[in-house]
């Protein structure tokens, strides 16, 4: 029988992290929760009322009392500001569409929060992610990151930036669990109503306030606002309200008339221009990535045949990834892919194994 471990569980306030904590406790582990206070001090008054923050933290503490484990609140607002929100805004200035979870996981959640958990005596750090970790074995000397068994909920895409040290300390109790089973568990306990439906919003931006948040933040960075909407021949078709309000593949909200549907095919920060074209102009068979992290294998020095996802809901597509220096790579797909978006991540897979990934630069 394996010995009991002292395990810290990152508690977001959702049902998945609670279920992860309960599973670990049922296995005989000494479990405690850690909740990350992350709304930056400069934003608390306007974007997330202090009362709302206190209400969420009180809710988490009540959950801990009900299910028999303590929960510590860790103030990481400054770290979240510098490691997540600032690079998030900088990416928009570059005409990119960033994913803040990609910044947060390696630096803050599995970085600062994991270190705080260790300082509180944790031997392992767990989250409610639907992903798996495979320990070193006969075929690999490294910890490997794997897709979650429930592929409809798999969250491995957001975790490719983790290090070997982080993987070695991490547990994913829901890795082999189906989301519907977690929902059924909550229903059986009569607590499903405590957890609202999953939000697709960014965690530090209130629902419906995305454009307002970006506008205020970018105003402080003196980002240019209005500019031209151009077709592929350079003709001006209209005016945009700031390139940060657009993303590759967008069709709605362009405010221009055309005999055929037009889509955003490029964002050009140097010219402060939005470029539009027909749907076929969105198809590309190659891209380049930077800030590459090879999570499950040593960094290769030869091309790698694998499958690549260019967004979380994208079906992995056959491609060849060619390393370029230490932290960059080029990707060539067997078939063109639609709406390759700079700022999003390209994540490399060999079956269920996450080989690595990086940020799409162009």
From Swiss-Prot:
Query: Catalysed reaction(s)?
Result: S-sulfanyl-L-cysteinyl-[protein] + uridine(34) in tRNA + AH2 + ATP = 2-thiouridine(34) in tRNA + L-cysteinyl-[protein] + A + AMP + diphosphate + H(+)
Looking up CDD domains in the UniProt record yields:
MnmA_TRMU-like (cd01998)
Subcellular localization is given as: Cytoplasm
Record: active site: 104, 203
List the disulfide bonds in this chain: 104-203
Question: Pfam families given for it?
Answer: tRNA_Me_trans, tRNA_Me_trans_C, tRNA_Me_trans_M
Annotated site residue numbers, Interaction with tRNA: 129, 344
Q: Which domain of life is it from?
A: Bacteria
HAMAP family reported for this sequence: tRNA_thiouridyl_MnmA
Task: Summarize the protein's role.
Answer: Catalyzes the 2-thiolation of uridine at the wobble position (U34) of tRNA, leading to the formation of s(2)U34.
Q: What is this protein called?
A: tRNA-specific 2-thiouridylase MnmA
């Amino acid at each position: 029988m394996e010995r009991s471990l002292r395990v810290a569980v990152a508690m977001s306030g959702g049902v998945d992290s609670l279920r992860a904590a309960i599973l670990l406790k049922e296995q005989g582990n000494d479990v405690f929760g850690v909740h990350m206070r992350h709304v930056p001090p400069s934003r608390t008054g306007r974007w997330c009322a202090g009362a709302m923050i206190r209400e969420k933290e009180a809710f988490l503490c009540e959950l801990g009392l009900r299910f028999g484990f303590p929960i510590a609140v860790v103030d990481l607002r400054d770290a979240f500001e510098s490691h997540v929100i600032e690079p998030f805004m900088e990416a928009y200035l570059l005409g990119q569409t960033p994913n803040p979870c990609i910044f947060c996981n390696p630096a803050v959640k599995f970085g600062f929060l994991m270190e705080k958990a260790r300082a509180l005596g944790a031997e392992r750090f767990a989250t409610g992610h639907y992903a798996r970790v495979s320990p070193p074995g006969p075929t690999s000397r490294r910890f490997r990151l794997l897709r979650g068994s429930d592929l409809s909920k798999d969250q491995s895409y957001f975790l490719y930036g983790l290090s070997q040290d982080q993987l070695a300390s991490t547990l994913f109790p829901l890795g082999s669990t189906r989301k519907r089973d977690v929902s059924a568990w909550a229903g059986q306990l009569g607590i499903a109503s405590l957890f609202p439906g999953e939000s697709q919003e960014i965690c530090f931006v209130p629902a419906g306030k995305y454009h307002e948040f970006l506008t205020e933040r970018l105003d402080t960075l003196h980002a240019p606002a209005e500019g031209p909407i151009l077709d592929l021949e350079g003709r001006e078709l209209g005016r945009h309200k700031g390139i940060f309000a657009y993303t590759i593949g967008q069709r709605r909200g362009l405010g221009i008339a055309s005999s055929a549907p037009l889509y955003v095919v490029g964002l050009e920060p140097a010219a402060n221009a939005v470029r539009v074209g027909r749907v076929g102009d969105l198809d590309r068979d190659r891209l380049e990535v930077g800030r590459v992290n090879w999570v499950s294998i040593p960094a290769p020095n030869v091309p790698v045949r694998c499958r690549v996802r260019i967004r979380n809901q994208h079906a992995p597509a056959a491609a060849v990834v060619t390393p370029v220096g230490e932290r960059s790579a080029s990707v060539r797909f067997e078939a063109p892919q639609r709406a390759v978006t700079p700022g999003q991540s390209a994540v490399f897979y060999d079956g269920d194994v996450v080989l690595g990934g990086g940020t799409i630069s162009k």
